[in-house]
Amino acid sequence: MDKTQLKRHDLVYPSSIGRARLKQVFLNELTGEKAFLAADIFRVDSVIPGIVRRAEVLSADVIPLGFVHPQLCEGRRLRLTAELEVGEAVKLKRPYELAAAEFKVSTNCLAAAQAVCSYAAERRLKLGILGSAGLEIATGLPFTNSESDLDLLITGLSLQQLQEVYTELQAIGKKFQVDIDLETELINGYGIKAAELFQPTQTVLGKSLQDVQILKKKTVVEILSQEA
């Protein structure tokens, strides 16, 4: 796997060797229910991927990932940060692929996701599914519940187009009583909350795998126009 091609929110699947190694790492660090859930995440036959995350300093042959178990532990998700060796990664899946996948609707969050995917397909939008909904679509495991929000990723739209799509997505969210959060992905690797672009400010917060920066909104709008 070419690590340089990875972007925020990408799903990376470890090999059986990688899972076995990470399982041992966390069994040495955790106890009780947390150790049990960690062992489940890193079972050889587990379908739970890691989510690419930002890390301060890492060698070139390591991929920083975050793993989540669908079961709550002490009232919250068990979130584990891990370092996977590049050679231990066997599959990559981008959030945009999840929007084209078939999935069972078990919660309002996924019902909203289904409606959003249909809307995006009709308009040929490049839209991706993130967060708990993305993990449930990717794995078939119950990551969403009655309180889940729907996190989305989109690219290839000008500011005006983005605002039109954002309005439609908020209407879908209202219909299913689900909060929808939309992030736009720029070609330079930065992700920006769409809602920030519509606020009367001169700057927005941009997040990439390398850093977090305050970006000039004018510059971001120019990039969006070039990508549309």
PLM regions and their residue ranges:
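Short, charged/polar "capping" segments at the starts of alpha-helices
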Residues: 161-162, 190
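Flexible, glycine-rich phosphate/dinucleotide-binding loops
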Residues: 74, 136, 189
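Polyanionic, low-complexity intrinsically disordered segments
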Residues: 220-227
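Conserved catalytic core of two-metal-ion nucleotidyltransferases
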Residues: 172-209
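Conserved beta-strand segments of the P-loop GTPase G domain that flank and frequently precede/overlap
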Residues: 66, 155-156, 183
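Active-site nucleotide-donor binding segment shared across nucleotidyl transfer reactions
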Residues: 117-150, 154-160, 169
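Helical scaffold of the NTase/Pol beta-like nucleotidyltransferase catalytic core
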Residues: 1-132, 166, 170-180
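Mature, function-bearing regions of proteins
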Residues: 87, 202-220
